[in-house]
């Protein structure tokens, strides 16, 4: 993994997670170009948690607009689109049981994470992938260092269903 997702420390205190995001597009002649090349900084959430919104779409299939969705005010997910984000969970992250009306791909990039479900708990390590299908869950970091995860959330039809 690139250094962009590493947690930066100054004097033993963790600083905001910074990620370089490169977005391609087309110029007026239809040639491929870089539209945005910028460093995005994480935003604090609940205690011991922060996230960086990397990209989002407001429809499926996606429309390749000229807008930069990093400026959008996103919630947990979008009703008809997709969200791509990085999240950092420090040890002892505040509990937050939740579910999304989306199909979520979660990738553990570094550290360890415990995913709590109604009936089970799963210990995840760097390289592990979770396919979250609208189930209620909670992320817990019982490790000794931060855990960084990437999430891709894709809107689903009909919301949450039992018996998948």
Give residue spans per PLM region.
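A short beta-strand-loop-beta hairpin characteristic of the jelly-roll/cupin
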Residues: 94-100, 105-125
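A short glycine-rich, His/Asp/Glu-containing loop-to-beta-strand
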Residues: 31-96, 152, 164
């Amino acid at each position: 993994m690139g250094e962009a997702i590493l947690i930066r420390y100054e004097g033993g205190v963790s600083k905001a997670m910074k990620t370089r995001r490169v977005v391609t597009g087309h110029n007026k002649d239809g040639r491929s170009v870089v539209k945005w090349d910028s460093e995005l900084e994480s935003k604090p959430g609940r205690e011991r948690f922060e996230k960086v919104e990397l990209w989002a779409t407001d429809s499926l299939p996606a429309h390749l607009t000229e807008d930069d969705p990093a400026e959008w005010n996103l919630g947990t997910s979008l009703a008809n689109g997709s969200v791509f984000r990085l999240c950092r969970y420090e040890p002892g992250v505040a509990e937050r049981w939740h579910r999304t009306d989306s199909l979520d791909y979660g990738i553990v990039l570094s550290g360890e994470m415990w995913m709590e479900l109604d009936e089970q708990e799963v210990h995840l390590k760097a390289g592990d992938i979770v396919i979250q299908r609208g189930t209620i869950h909670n992320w817990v970091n019982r490790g000794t260092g931060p855990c960084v995860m990437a999430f891709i959330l894709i809107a689903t039809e009909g919301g949450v269903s039992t018996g998948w």
